[in-house]
Each structure stands twice: as C-alpha cells, then as structure tokens.
C-alpha cells in the first residue's frame, strides 16, 4: 500500500464562519489559522495548500485579555528614515478593527510561500454581516473562556 499524498485537484475547499463577538483574539486566530492551513483534515499536507476559506464576523467586538488594550502596539515602517509608525490597540480598534484579527491570524500562519495563498482565503468583517452567503458557509464555535 502506498502513502497517500494530496494533490491540488483533490482538495475540496469549504467555507467556515467564525463569530468573534466576545471571544478572546488568540482563540479566534488559532482556529482560523488551523482551518486556513487545512490541519483539520485527514489529507493535510505541509507543502500543499489544503485549507478552507474562513469568514470572521464581529471583529470590532473581539476580546483582549489583561492590559493589552493599553499596552500592546502595532508597528509599521515606511522604509524611510524616521518612518516608524506606532499605534496602540485602542487606536487601531477605533480606526480599523479588522486589522487586529488579520494581524493575529497572519502571525500564526507558516512563514513560507504558501502563507500568501492561505491568507487570501481569510475574510474579516467588523460587523455581523458578510456577502458570502452564496457559498453556504458552516458556522464554527470557538470557546470564549
């Protein structure tokens, strides 16, 4: 008997919806990264994108533990001298709440060429609605403790 190796044509992509309302950011990001990589499937292959599409709702209502709301910062650099921009989570949540979830999930994806393909399958929305109803996504529960 030969070892089964998945091929790109053998992967059937499904759609999943995760509601982040009141759930800790790390728990949402961990579940999303697992689904995007395809680690929930029996045909998971590390060198192949076997993951599904993930839609995350209510990104503006995601929960942070401890004092992260005041202490955690996001850094961006333009590449020019003195081009470092630093923003606290409190400011990012008001200006662009989707970025909190996107950055957390992106950090949990592998640092390989496949990560861009996996990241493209992530859709994050600040509110409770999304335009992907035609794909018939299944709802995924994430522990909120």
Enumerate the language-model features and the residues they cover.
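Acidic, metal-associated active-site segment
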Residues: 106
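C-terminal structural segments of small proteins and small subunits
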Residues: 109-131
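Ribosome large-subunit tunnel/peptidyl-transferase-proximal elements
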Residues: 1-103, 113, 131-145
């Amino acid at each position: 008997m030969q070892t089964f190796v998945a091929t790109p044509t053998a992967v059937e992509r499904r759609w999943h919806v995760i509601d982040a309302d009141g759930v800790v950011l790390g728990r949402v990001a961990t579940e999303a990264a697992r689904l995007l990589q395809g680690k929930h499937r029996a045909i998971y292959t590390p060198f192949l994108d076997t993951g599904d599409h993930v839609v995350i709702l209510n990104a503006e209502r995601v929960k942070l533990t401890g004092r992260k709301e005041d202490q955690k910062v996001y850094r961006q650099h333009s590449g020019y001298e003195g081009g470092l921009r630093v923003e606290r989570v409190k400011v990012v949540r008001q200006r662009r709440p989707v970025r909190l979830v996107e950055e957390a999930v992106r950090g949990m994806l592998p640092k390989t060429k496949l990560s861009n393909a996996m990241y493209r399958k992530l859709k994050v929305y600040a509110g409770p609605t999304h335009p992907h109803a035609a794909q018939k996504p299944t709802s995924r529960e994430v522990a909120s403790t």
